[in-house]
């Protein structure tokens, strides 16, 4: 017996003797569940004193009572902490003040995050139900949308943190399994025992559930019009591609091992090869939108382009090559002079108008003047300069495109060029990624910025 297999046997024996008997676990679980049930009964008793309809909240708490009976003792103990936080927050709920209600809800969410490191399993369902009941019961119509947004954002934050934690756990699992497979690969005389141990260690569906969750998250976020959501989506794409590469690396190692063994294992190698091809195709379909941009993905594009402005974007570009995703269209410019022609009015291009000491950018008809200098900065973004004046977008609603003599226009004048599949570009700024440069429909055709998607008026041909 090899030293490695001896260590595995020792580890198995240690783990086998480290856990208490099933009977002891069962008694411990019943005791913990009873404690939670008692706490919930106490809270329901307090609710009865409120003098208002608390049916939904009681039902939510009773749902927790039933759910914990099926959970491991360790989970029940954690849920007990959450239930306690509900009881501790009742004084805030009783006031009826919407800010107190929101504060109480956030206390519960924070308790979940502290106890679980993220709302896991039973906790997230229980907490979501409790929060919903509390909001409907105590806040009524006085609950402002801004307060609700705070609570929704808190849930998003902890859900995302949970997902990131799970990805990190999957990476650790991968590292352990790939180390084991590599050790077997170095064995000169492969036996059926070696190959069967690899087959048991490497599941064909490794990481499938996690990647499926990430795919769903990416598909939702790719069309979001919320800045934070779009930014998180880019980060999740990076994690998704990392995990996908790990999975295919692992499968490739096993395929090579089976091919080396030959015989009956050739069929297993072929089956895994087909699975790997299907995996790569699914990954390619999930992320190709970044390099084949449509307007509905434009906000994600504002956080992905220019690619060399962030480590996540650089990492995504490198990893997409592994899956055969086509490179994006040109998204950087080298300081030469160009003409920016509008798609909606293709006889109009950006020019500059000076009036009373002010410099405004607008559209000029039938202009063939290639006088706009698009220069790439060290941070990856670009400046747009015309006749010594650098364009920047003002902070006003649908801000104007003004010009400054300053060499550095600041983040309002750091532009991102997002390449669309139709050959045009959408243009946003580092300062306001969700506002896109467009030509207004007035007689002057002034250059302004529009929130989210200005359609053809906000699409530009760079000539």
Curated annotation (Swiss-Prot):
> Remarks, anything else?
CaTX-A and CaTX-B are probably encoded by the same gene. They differ by their molecular masses (43 and 45 kDa, respectively). In addition, CaTX-A is primarily localized in nematocysts, whereas CaTX-B is only detected in the tentacles without nematocyst.
Taxonomic source organism: Carybdea alata (Hawaiian box jellyfish)
Q: Which residues form the signal peptide?
A: 1-18
What is the stated purpose of this protein? Has potent hemolytic activity. Is lethal to crayfish. Causes cutaneous inflammation in humans. May act as a pore-forming toxin, disrupting normal transmembrane ion concentration gradients in susceptible cells.
Classification of source organism: Eukaryota, Metazoa, Cnidaria, Cubozoa, Carybdeida
What quaternary arrangement does the UniProt entry report? Oligomer.
GO terms for biological process?
A: killing of cells of another organism; monoatomic ion transport
Which Gene Ontology cellular component terms are annotated? extracellular region; membrane; nematocyst; other organism cell membrane
Name it.
Toxin CaTX-A
Q: Where in the cell is it found?
A: Secreted; Nematocyst; Target cell membrane
Q: Which family does it belong to?
A: Belongs to the jellyfish toxin family. Type II subfamily.
For this protein, the record's Gene3D superfamilies field holds: Pesticidal crystal protein, N-terminal domain
Posttranslational modification: Contains disulfide bonds.
| Stored InterPro entries | Pest_crys_N_sf (IPR036716)
- Keyword annotations from UniProtKB, A to Z: Cytolysis, Disulfide bond, Hemolysis, Ion transport, Membrane, Nematocyst, Secreted, Signal, Target cell membrane, Target membrane, Toxin, Transmembrane, Transport
């Amino acid at each position: 017996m090899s030293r490695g297999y001896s260590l595995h046997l020792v580890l198995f024996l240690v783990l086998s003797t480290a856990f208490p008997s099933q009977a002891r676990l069962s008694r411990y679980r019943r005791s913990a569940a009873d404690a939670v049930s008692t706490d919930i009964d106490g809270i329901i008793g307090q609710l009865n004193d409120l003098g208002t309809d608390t049916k939904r909240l009681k039902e939510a708490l009773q749902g927790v009572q039933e759910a914990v009976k099926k959970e491991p003792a360790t989970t029940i103990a954690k849920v007990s902490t959450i239930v306690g936080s509900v009881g501790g927050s009742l004084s805030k709920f009783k006031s009826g003040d919407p800010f107190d209600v929101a504060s109480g809800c956030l206390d519960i969410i924070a308790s979940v995050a502290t106890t679980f490191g993220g709302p896991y399993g039973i906790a997230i369902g229980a907490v979501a139900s409790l929060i919903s009941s509390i909001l409907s019961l105590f806040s009524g119509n006085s609950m402002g949308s801004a307060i609700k947004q705070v609570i929704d954002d808190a849930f998003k934050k902890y859900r995302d943190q949970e997902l990131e934690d799970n990805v990190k756990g999957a990476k650790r699992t991968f590292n352990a399994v790939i180390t084991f497979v590599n050790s077997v690969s170095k064995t000169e005389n492969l036996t059926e025992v070696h190959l069967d141990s690899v087959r048991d260690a490497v599941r064909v569906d490794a990481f499938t559930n996690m990647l499926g969750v990430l795919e769903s998250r990416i598909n939702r976020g790719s069309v979001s019009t919320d800045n934070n959501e779009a930014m998180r989506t880019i980060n999740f794409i990076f994690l998704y591609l990392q995990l996908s590469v790990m999975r295919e690396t692992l499968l490739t190692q096993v395929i090579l091992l089976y091919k080396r063994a030959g015989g009956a294992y050739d069929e297993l190698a072929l089956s895994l090869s087909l699975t790997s091809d299907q995996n790569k195709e699914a990954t390619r379909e999930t992320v190709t939108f970044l390099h084949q941009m449509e307007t509905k993905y434009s906000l994600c594009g504002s956080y992905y382009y220019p690619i060399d402005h962030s480590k996540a974007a650089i990492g995504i570009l490198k990893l997409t090559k592994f899956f055969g995703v086509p490179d994006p269209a040109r998204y950087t410019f080298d300081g030469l002079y160009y003409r920016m022609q509008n798609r909606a009015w293709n006889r109009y291009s950006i020019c500059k108008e000076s009036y009373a000491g002010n410099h405004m950018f607008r559209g000029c008809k039938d202009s063939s003047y290639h006088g706009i200098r698009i220069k790439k900065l060290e941070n990856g973004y670009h400046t747009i300069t015309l006749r010594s004046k650098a364009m920047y977008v003002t902070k006003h609603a649908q801000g104007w495109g003004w010009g400054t003599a300053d060499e550095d226009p600041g983040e309002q004048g750091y532009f991102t060029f997002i390449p669309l599949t139709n050959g045009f570009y959408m243009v946003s700024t580092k300062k306001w990624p969700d506002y896109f440069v467009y030509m207004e429909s007035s007689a002057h055709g002034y250059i302004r910025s529009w929130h989210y998607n200005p359609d053809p008026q906000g699409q530009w041909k760079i000539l």
